[in-house]
Regions:
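Active-site cores that bind ATP or allylic diphosphates and position pyrophosphate for catalysis
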Residues: 1-270
Length: 270
């Protein structure tokens, strides 16, 4: 009210994200740690959920729809070139496949059918009878219709889609709370350039958290068979591995499972 902003703006995903950043900065400041000064940057062009480009700006939703619906790579490249940097355009066009919402929806329906309501209530973010609403919505024929049916002011579509990920990954409220309270227990290296490699050496020598170049240094395939014996750091990483497997299942027949065990960090030439 003091800023004379429309109330609906407070419920937009980027606003929520900004507020969480401010909250985290406030916590760090109370601990006496130096924090950067936050800056509010006005969004230009397309809004977060817009489905059409505005000028030279497009939302992530628009880019995903263009990628999914384009008839061929040449058409996709032509559509993307005015909207994204050349390197991003090349990366999108060169990608061979993307997760299929229809496949995700079939996994979701089975998960809902095979989990008791009491079990659903233990999933992060599911409360206030939402599990019953989800069970009633599984007869909708598509992922988008399922999400649309559950969407409300309290549960925007982006939140519903996050809850779907939580459910498919069996993200237990109690376990996630333990992870949140513990904070990061390792640093996983995904990519680096020559400068990053030097920085990683310093982190390895001075930092308090272990660096993971390969997941096997913390969790091997045998460990995954005995989740009850895992420590908290291993449980964190196993959830990461499960997320990669979920994406592979959504890609279809050509994707390999357990890709986290197949790839080393990417080295980028300067």
């Amino acid at each position: 009210e003091k800023l004379h902003l429309p109330e609906a703006m407070l419920y937009e995903p980027n606003t929520i994200l900004a507020l969480e950043y401010l909250r985290s900065l406030g916590k760090l400041q109370k601990q006496g740690q130096p924090v950067p000064k936050p800056w509010a940057v006005r969004r230009q062009g397309a809004g977060h959920g817009d489905t059409l480009p505005k000028g030279k700006f497009a939302s992530g939703t628009t880019l995903r729809q263009m990628t999914a619906n384009s008839p061929d790579k040449n058409s996709l490249k032509k559509d993307l070139e005015p909207l994204v940097p050349p390197a991003v355009c090349q990366a999108i066009v060169s990608c061979t496949s993307y997760p299929d919402k229809a496949k995700i929806y079939q996994l979701l329906r089975y998960k809902l059918l095979s989990t008791a309501p009491q079990g659903l209530q233990q999933i992060l973010g599911i409360s206030e009878g939402l599990e019953q609403a989800m069970l009633q919505a599984i007869n909708f024929p598509s992922y988008d219709e399922f999400v649309h049916h559950l969407t409300s002011r309290r549960y925007p579509s982006t939140r519903i889609q996050r809850l779907i990920s939580h459910l498919l990954l069996s993200m237990n409220k109690e376990l996630v709370e333990k992870m949140d309270n513990a904070g990061p227990l390792y640093l996983r290296v995904l990519a680096m350039d020559s400068t990053g490699r030097q920085l990683l050496r310093q982190i390895k020598n001075r930092g308090r958290l272990p660096l993971l170049n390969k997941v096997t240094s913390l969790v091997n395939r045998r460990d995954l068979l005995h989740p009850e014996a895992m420590n908290l750091a291993q449980q964190m990483l196993s959830m990461d591995i499960a997320a990669t497997n979920l994406r592979s299942l959504a890609l279809g027949e050509t994707a390999s499972l357990y890709e986290d065990y197949l790839h080393s960090p990417c080295y980028i030439e300067n």
